[in-house]
Swiss-Prot record:
Encoding gene, per UniProt annotation: PPCA
Subcellular location: Cytoplasm
GO molecular function: phosphoenolpyruvate carboxylase activity
Enzyme superclass (EC): lyase
Identification of the protein by name: Phosphoenolpyruvate carboxylase 1
Organism taxonomic ancestry: Eukaryota, Viridiplantae, Streptophyta, Embryophyta, Tracheophyta
Assembly with partners or alone: Homotetramer.
Reactions catalysed according to its record: oxaloacetate + phosphate = phosphoenolpyruvate + hydrogencarbonate
Residues with Phosphoserine modification: S11
Similarity field: Belongs to the PEPCase type 1 family.
One GO cellular component, as annotated: chloroplast
NCBIfam families linked: PRK00009.1 (NF000584)
Function: Through the carboxylation of phosphoenolpyruvate (PEP) it forms oxaloacetate, a four-carbon dicarboxylic acid source for the tricarboxylic acid cycle.
Length: 966
């Protein structure tokens, strides 16, 4: 082997140290973790595909690392020549390798973050990134601040805490680009790495863990990263529910127990009541039909039954353990009477149980009670299973649990009895954990929200009024619609019969509401109306629920998304609250959802964020005026462009009183894995939401000064105008966007069940927010996040020199503005206009090149002004740890970007000529044919062999590297 080859074997480790030459702190082992995982992977790569492939990967990395140091565009061209010279099989192997290395880098980072938090608290203000936003002692730190700094009493804190609610809503937004098969393997790699660096590890343990690590890395690399079929809504629901089984189910009682301990440490001897609604879970998976024709009424029914079956099964799997624990004979008379009554009717053996299958003696009264609970859980599970399989069940409803109170009553009886007999420590063990699970998850595991677009309800109403011969509802004014809807809601007559003419769309809406009427009411949460614009949107759904005989109507939640709809939201809610019928219907409680994604796409991030801040304030005023308790439902995505950002700071930056102890927020796509993929992540997530909601309520942020508001209003007007002048008013912008990004190829990733557009044809307006953000994220340009900000800053700074100091004051003293600017800074740190320029050079026609040049100049100007406002010389100078992490992963992402840009060129331009060098892994092809076999995984591709898979792998890799998709 040549000296050059020998040198290359250690080159990536050396490059890592050059990119991040010094440790950020004494506990920093990130480079060590990174180097170990890469070393193991490169050995595996050589064993599977040969030494030449390994050297090629290392050479590409070196070139990319050199580009990161110099930012010389020629280096990108050299990288391009290298990747285009690879044949189909080798191209897939290389793209797969870099994507895999980025996933390994993420895992190294997660282990380092977990270790860092155990060793040392993160310094105050280090919050740009979710992982460094707060320490593991969030709850204790929050309680300390409230008591020491704000002089709140422990009892006041306890009363506030036990009455607050955080509802986390899992959605199937198609942003999770990593397959579940790989996520599980990644979890095992993470565990192996963490254990390898444990202090008390023996040499034998170390050897076995190293072998296990290599095994899992190889298994992950050998797994096809690409979903070959599009997931169904049922697939998405099962994937989402797997987190409950793996982390959330046991994570909730663990978190609540830690909360008890934190409260005890401040002098509260009472435990958080088991039925305090601190944490709740909801889901849109199988209920969100907005723009997704695959979510049918049958899907909704199946998803609800599956969730009930899963819940009963998880309770059932724990009940034996509880029966083992509650073996005591001493009990209250109340419990003994119940046990004796049950004992009379339970003479038979139960051979289908493993434990306690014979009749339980009356001297074990708690077990007698729990055996009856177990029987009902068994039948509850089996009835759901049968209904799911064949739509009928031989098991009578009476043998099952149908109401949560039926389930809790015998458990409460056991708890009361244990406490009365001096066994409170036993009662506060597994029984309390179990009761907390029942109170949190109920019989349905999660409550399913239904989401439908307002236009679909208008279609139904139009069909009804036309059928009744009273005109076209669609043509009526808003006032006439409201008058008619209210007259029907106040009346008793049926509105339509089976003879109502129905299109498929109308049948879908009505059949969905019929499913709501058919299934147990505790299966459902809210009925969310997307693209809501007026009070009639809400009243129409209320009327449809009544017509379909929904016994316990779902609360109706308008979702205001576009800028104009957000501005009109307070007036809409004022009108609704003024209606006596509606006021009586809501019983003093109203939920309103605001959408971060579509508002950002409509007006740009800055304008949308400020408008949502103001609309929350206005909605709060309206609610207070009418004596209504308002709950804001935040439709946040994972990326900054879709409202993402560190949880704690995002909550604390909301206007004062708008949370008020009640918060709903979506947990979307890849954010589910980042929040609940591991036990410690689950614990951290529950802690952050609870702590931030408590702190916001007890220490509300100060309202911005009038002059700050005026300045932000000016900035929003300018930012919106600049954003729309390009995105919506430039006649050829859509053409440029589709050429300069992989937007048209997005659907090939098969990462979600819904189409990327609400309507098959149309421009940016009909494009969903996720592919819009996804496409710009892939090219590292992040246009939707920053476009308009530079123009806004320029306008106010040039208008009045004093605005410079005012902006600096806002940055230091206004949490909303601080978080907005810091998140923009983080996005710029992840961006690279030279990469975007490469896409333009290769993919954009000559007459449209000026678009990119103009936008890149705007990008640089915006970045400069942003740093000026923040008082920073360099990006992320206040967060060296995040800066280090981004620098370490940039060379991988850059290689994938170059590979992606050239692959898109080859796909879109059949005349693009490349010179392939001979197959790199020739020496082992005869034995394994590994690279060639990868090409065969996609036999039906419409493109030249290997191109489509290479493209998809680069998209997945870039998403993993930036830790954002859409």
């Amino acid at each position: 082997m040549s000296t050059v080859k020998l040198d290359r074997l250690t080159s990536i480790d050396a490059q890592l140290r050059l990119l991040a030459p010094k440790k950020v702190s004494e506990d920093d082992k990130l480079i060590e973790y990174d180097a170990l995982l890469l070393d193991r992977f490169l050995d595996i790569l050589q064993n599977l595909h040969g030494e030449d492939i390994k050297e090629t990967v290392q050479e590409l990395y070196e070139q990319s690392a050199e580009y990161e140091r110099t930012h010389d565009p020629k280096k990108l061209e050299e990288l391009g020549s290298m990747v285009t010279s690879l044949d189909a099989g080798d191209s897939i192997v290389v793209a797969k390798s870099f994507s895999h290395m980025l996933n390994l880098a993420n895992l190294a980072e997660e282990v380092q973050i977990s270790r860092r938090k155990r060793v040392k608290k993160v310094k105050k203000g280090d919050f740009m990134d979710e992982n460094t936003a707060m320490t593991e002692s969030d709850m204790e730190e929050t309680l300390r601040r409230l008591i020491v700094d704000l002089k709140k009493s422990p009892q006041e804190i306890f009363e506030t805490l036990k009455n607050q609610t955080v509802d986390l809503v899992f959605t199937a937004h198609p942003t999770q680009s990593v397959r579940r098969s790989l996520l599980q393997k990644h979890g095992r790699i993470r565990d192996c790495l963490a254990q390898l660096y444990a202090k008390d590890i023996t040499p034998d343990d170390k050897q076995e863990l190293d072998e296990a690590l290599q095994r899992e890395i190889q298994a992950a690399f050998r797994t096809d990263e690409i979903r070959r079929t599009q997931p169904t809504p049922q697939d998405e629901m099962r994937a989402g529910m797997s987190y409950f089984h793996e982390t959330i189910w046991n994570g909730v009682p663990k978190f609540l127990r830690r909360l008890d301990t934190a409260l005890k440490n401040i002098g509260i001897t009472e435990r958080v009541p088991y039925n305090a609604p601190l944490i709740q879970f909801s889901s849109w998976m199988g209920g969100d039909r907005d723009g997704n024709p695959r979510v049918t009424p049958e899907v909704t029914r199946d998803v609800c039954l599956l969730a009930r079956m899963m819940a009963a099964n998880m309770y059932f799997s724990q009940i034996d353990e509880l029966m083992f624990e509650l073996s005591m004979w001493r009990c209250t008379d109340e419990l003994r009477e119940r046990a004796e009554e049950l004992h009379k009717y339970s003479k038979r053996d139960s051979k289908h149980y493993i434990e306690f299958w014979k009749q339980i003696p009356s001297s074990e009264p708690y077990r007698v009670i729990l055996a009856d609970v177990r029987d009902k859980l068994y039948y509850t599970r089996e009835r759901s299973r049968q209904l799911l399989a064949s739509e009928v069940s031989e098991i009578p409803v009476e043998a099952t649990f149908t109401e949560i109170d039926q389930f809790l009553e015998p458990l409460e009886l056991c708890y009361r009895s244990l406490c009365a007999c001096g066994d409170r420590p036993v009662a506060d063990g597994s029984l309390l954990d179990f009761m907390r699970q029942v109170a949190t998850f109920g019989l349905c595991l999660v409550k399913l929200d239904i989401r439908q677009e307002s236009e679909r309800h208008t279609d139904v109403m139009d069909a009804i009024t036309t059928h009744l011969g009273i005109g076209s509802y669609r043509d009526w004014t808003e006032e006439k619609r409201q008058d008619w809807l209210l007259s029907e809601l106040r009346g008793k007559r049926p509105l339509f019969g089976p003879d109502l003419p129905r299109t498929d769309e109308i049948a879908d809406v009505l059949d969905t509401i019929n499913v709501i009427a058919e299934l147990p009411s505790d299966s459902f949460g809210a009925y969310v109306i997307s693209m809501a614009t007026a009070p009639s949107d809400v009243l129409a759904v209320e009327l449809l629920q009544r017509e379909c005989k929904v016994k316990k109507p779902l609360r109706v939640v308008p979702l205001f998304e576009k800028l104009a709809d957000l501005e009109a939201a307070p007036a809409s809610m004022t009108r609704l609250f003024s209606v006596d019928w509606y006021k009586n219907r809501i019983d003093g409680k109203q939920e309103v959802m605001i959408g971060y994604s579509d508002s950002g796409k409509d007006a740009g991030r800055l304008s949308a964020a400020w408008q949502m801040y103001k609309v929350q304030e206005e909605l709060l005023k309206v609610s207070k005026k009418f004596g209504v308790k308002l709950t804001m439902f935040h439709g946040r995505g994972g990326t900054v462009g879709r409202g993402g950002g560190p949880t704690h700071l995002a909550i604390l930056a909301q206007p004062a009183e708008t949370i008020g102890g009640s918060l709903r927020v979506t947990i979307q796509g890849e954010v589910i894995e980042q929040s609940f993929g591991e036990q410690h992540l689950c614990f951290r997530t529950l802690q952050r939401y609870t702590a931030a909601t408590l702190e916001h309520g007890m220490n509300p942020p100060k309202s911005p000064k009038p002059e700050w508001r005026a300045l932000l209003d000016q900035m929003a007007v300018v930012a919106t105008e600049e954003y729309r002048s390009i995105v919506f008013k430039e006649p050829r912008f859509v053409e440029y966007f589709r050429l300069a990004t992989p937007e048209t190829e997005y659907g090939r990733m098969n990462i979600g069940s819904r189409p990327s557009k609400r309507k098959p044809s149309g421009g940016i307006e009909s494009l969903r927010a996720i592919p819009w953000i996804f496409a710009w994220t892939q090219t590292r340009f992040h246009l939707p996040v920053w476009l308009g900000v530079g123009g806004a800053l320029k306008h106010v700074l040039e208008k009045d020199i004093r605005n410079h100091n005012m902006l600096r004051d806002m940055y230091n003293n206004f949490p909303f503005f601080r978080v907005t600017i810091d998140l923009l800074e983080m996005v710029f740190a992840k961006g690279d206009p030279e990469i975007a320029a490469l896409y333009d050079k290769l993919l954009v026609s000559e007459e449209l090149q000026s678009f990119g040049e103009r936008l890149r100049a705007n990008y640089e100007d915006t970045k400069r002004r942003l740093l000026e406002v923040a008082g920073h010389k360099d990006l992320l100078e206040g967060d060296p740890y995040l800066k280090q992490r981004l620098r370490l992963r940039d060379p991988y992402i850059t290689t994938l970007n170059v590979c992606q840009a050239y692959t898109l060129k080859r796909i879109r331009d059949p005349d693009f000529k490349v010179t392939e060098r001979p197959h790199l892994s020739k020496e082992i092809m005869d034995a394994h044919k590994a690279a060639a076999e990868l090409v065969k995984l996609n036999p039906t591709s419409e493109y030249a062999p290997g191109l489509e898979d290479t493209l998809i792998l680069t998209m997945k890799g870039v998403a993993a590297g930036l830790q954002n998709t859409g």
